[in-house]
């Protein structure tokens, strides 16, 4: 009798003396027929037993060719470097794989890009070298130190050095990394950015904002691409040979012709040459895998496995040149192109887009011809899920853990509408849901673009998937998304039809797309794909509660002893004065961060611009211009990201109520209580980052009254206009302020209101707040989720609070709910979940996502992480393995209000 997936994993873990527990057993039992294929289970086992590995092969060949081509046109020089790197990647095929290729020669991992950012490796170079020397004498016992981070290499062991708290690198590769990093000192995007940023007269303010974590990180060199939607149209419609031929013809037409533009018109020749160079590198990479598959076929003795290798050879040799003929070939090509895209740059959030609609032409024709069965399609999609989950993003420890939580945000959107306004749901999208229910991996996360035109059975299927506790699909209001597209991109020619092509880029960034006409075997299909720049580069995460803290502290950060803003020297005698100073500080922050980011991105586009993503997205090939020259159709995508909105709103409400309306306490008494953390230890000392289990040190009771009053003050999420109107006023103001900001492309910006994981580290950097939150504890998640435990009047009261403002005028908002599994048990429970979701979206909510798990399970998983290797939770726009999350985020998820009735 065959084992279930859970039994299989349990047996593997128990063989290592690890106990296994599974979330949502009651809901899982409803769908106990949902099992991944044996092949997918085996490959998932490989993933569970694989560590994230940093590899120097790609950067070595990139760097070598880049030096060799010194003096060439920058975009061509970069293309040659990418070509060399792809051409020399060592192929690695795991037994049983039907979808092959990966970021590096390792099953899971990534690589550093010192040409983008090298300071971390230079600064840590000596430490890493010393650690590499020391490791030679380490004993096997030190292996036991690792484990609680899942696949993260959080500590060095054996022959492996931990880098950025996530990746393991073989000690012999460390000197190569350090040497290469030193070569880029003063030349990297990061260093050049810093050099020119310092020419801003208010550069010190920018540095202070970064040092105090009011701003989380510089996006211009950390993650310059991503949080956008890829476009697979050109490879799928023309094949790689076809794109080369197109570029060659365009070269002939534009060589020496400025076409009325004496500046960038001449750049077209160099861009088309760069396209040819890069695609030739991709073709070599694919064909190297074909050669490797042919070799494996030659030594394989099992006839079935031998045939599988033979099939891989045929598929890879074909897609290296031509339009895919079958569903499997199309799936392999899109996956290959996706890996190529994320290998080009430091990228997180290169989202897949409307995948079920993109691959539908091949699915439809293969099914009609009897070339494939639905079960075979589901297995391929399961294997695809595992491969996407293997993608890692190399970034600093602060970005990887503090922002991304190790996630890469390859979001796949389902539902929505077609170009003509009819439902976008199709049978392949149902199979995507089925595959995600059988093979529960964090990637690709699913997002349902909810529209009233979508079929009920399709929506019920999605609700069933959500019930399993994997955190997806998240639900997004399709109407809100198209409204925002029309508002933000009207100046660039956005139409209603094209607005329907949007999808989610990254975890929750609404990203513009377009429709292209794909022809397969004489039949034409309209498919959507990305058509815009990064929808998540710009000002990266302003800590709203921290700005308020500095208002109260006269511009000074007492934790760091830094005078961040010029002292306002105002007595703050009125609530209006507090608001006035807050707005002034906030606008100062946006302004200086916007200009610094513009400099960083300008240097990036000049020296490290995208070629792969440029050739993929409209209208770069038509214009002959890369992303840096606004080759994309839509360029008004850069944003201002914020964090801790509800913590800020609750704090304003407490100040207004206690200090200014009721006059129960003076502003000085409030400041004193905040500076002394209401008589408690800092969360960093306690080691718990939610409000639970905090330790009181003041024995006099000096702060008891004000602390209780702050906790009892009006809170957002209870349909109480006292607090909710503060949110409304803030949102209206923020939208206008962001529109006044201007990106390097001279386009207006807009608010992006997601926390990802920044509410952990930014909360850790913030003193106590007037709402009663203690120093160092995590902020509220998302942007319209209630602060943990403060939503007392039920979920529908929370919905009323969240929709007090027009969520369609900004890029996004974020609502997280935690439901006990028994709340939505059975078919009626599924309907209840769908009705709950509908209720919020029909009221104008933009986004809602669910954790269907009980808090006791999470608490046990925190104590015994190795027992819950496959447990996943929804954080803030993304799903991640519990054991790969940092403790501040774990504490926040545990503390969220758990609804047992809806």
UniProtKB/Swiss-Prot annotation:
Modification comment: Requires the activating protein CsdA to generate the key active site glycyl radical that is involved in catalysis.
Single Gene Ontology MF annotation: 4-hydroxyphenylacetate decarboxylase activity
Domain PFL: 38-774
Keywords per UniProt: Lyase, Organic radical, Phosphoprotein
Pfam families assigned: Gly_radical, PFL-like
Residues annotated with Glycine radical modification: 877
Domain Glycine radical stretches: 782-902
GO CC, one annotated term: cytosol
EC number from the UniProt entry: 4.1.1.83
Catalytic activity: 4-hydroxyphenylacetate + H(+) = 4-methylphenol + CO2; 3,4-dihydroxyphenylacetate + H(+) = 4-methylcatechol + CO2
Binding site for 4-hydroxyphenylacetate: 348, 507, 540, 641
Entries under PROSITE patterns matching the protein: GLY_RADICAL_2, PFL
Active-site annotation: 507 (cysteine radical intermediate), 509 (proton donor)
Record bears the keyword Membrane: no
General function of this protein: Glycyl radical subunit of the HPA decarboxylase that decarboxylates phenylacetates with a hydroxyl group in the p-position. Active toward 4-hydroxyphenylacetate and 3,4-dihydroxyphenylacetate, forming 4-methylphenol and 4-methylcatechol, respectively. Is likely involved in the catabolism of aromatic amino acids such as tyrosine fermentation. 4-methylphenol (p-cresol) formation provides metabolic toxicity, which allows an active suppression of other microbes and may provide growth advantages for the producers in highly competitive environments.
Record family assignment: Belongs to the glycyl radical enzyme (GRE) family. HPAD subfamily.
Quaternary context: Heterooctamer consisting of 4 large (HpdB) subunits and 4 small (HpdC) subunits, arranged as a tetramer of heterodimers. Also forms a catalytically inactive homodimer.
Protein name: 4-hydroxyphenylacetate decarboxylase glycyl radical subunit
Gene this chain is encoded by: hpdB
